[in-house]
Amino acid sequence: MAKDDSTVRCFQGLLIFGNVIIGMCSIALMAECIFFVSDQNSLYPLLEATNNDDIYAAAWIGMFVGICLFCLSVLGIVGIMKSNRKILLVYFILMFIVYAFEVASCITAATQRDFFTPNLFLKQMLERYQNNSPPNNDDQWKNNGVTKTWDRLMLQDNCCGVNGPSDWQKYTSAFRTENSDADYPWPRQCCVMNSLKEPLNLDACKLGVPGYYHSQGCYELISGPMNRHAWGVAWFGFAILCWTFWVLLGTMFYWSRIDY
């Protein structure tokens, strides 16, 4: 292939442009995954307690892929500009490996969205919230994390339980074992608070008088951020894979036409 041919130069330009887009998207993917794993909503303890935090694993893979794709896009640009078969061969091999990792990340993130059901968080809350009799230290750590997270959620977001205050009444729970039904029909965090973070009217809250306790459940406030992050990691990653596929295909065609 003649390197001074105008058609070749145009094709090189297209491939370079494709790799520039890959590099830019990889930075965005990395930033998105960093934001996710930084746990801005402080919900990780709830997932950790379920023993299924694969969505975070998908985000960590996405971070790794973002770094690798950026480096490989630079390598690809250099190989195309120099029309170097060896550089491009290394580019292909590494890109296929990274591509496989990103496929795994996308599939994991997409499938985990179906995992965030009300019953999952309800079962975990009933078993672990204020559970002071764990079988081992690992469970104690998880129980403490779940308790602190639920306390913060209910206070900060003015909600109670997964589906509502009735969760604490309808089901057997560690909280019910530790507290009497008359004095603690639900956690104090379910009460409407004053400026000092004290119940506005404790007796009215315990009796379930409207306006003195929070009747809304917390499920949407938990699943919403997790689903959005899982959707972003999965589908933005999938979009990058689609673009990368065509860039790789074009680069392979270009590689096959380079003179030895």
UniProtKB/Swiss-Prot annotation:
The chain crosses the membrane at residues 16-36, 61-81, 87-107, 230-250. Pfam families: Tetraspanin. The keyword Transmembrane helix applies. It is found in: Membrane. GO terms for molecular function: structural molecule activity. Residues 37-60, 108-229 are extracellular. It comes from the Eukaryota. Bladder epithelium. It is a multi-pass membrane protein. InterPro entries: Tetraspanin/Peripherin, Tetraspanin_animals, Tetraspanin_EC2_sf. GO terms for biological process: protein localization to cell surface. N-glycosylated with high-mannose oligosaccharides. Residues 2-15, 82-86, 251-260 are cytoplasmic. GO terms for cellular component: apical plasma membrane urothelial plaque; endoplasmic reticulum; membrane; plasma membrane; protein-containing complex. Its main location: membrane. Keywords: Glycoprotein, Membrane, Transmembrane, Transmembrane helix. Component of the asymmetric unit membrane (AUM); a highly specialized biomembrane elaborated by terminally differentiated urothelial cells. May play an important role in normal bladder epithelial physiology, possibly in regulating membrane permeability of superficial umbrella cells or in stabilizing the apical membrane through AUM/cytoskeletal interactions. Heterodimer with uroplakin-3A (UPK3A) or uroplakin-3B (UPK3B). Belongs to the tetraspanin (TM4SF) family. This is Uroplakin-1b.
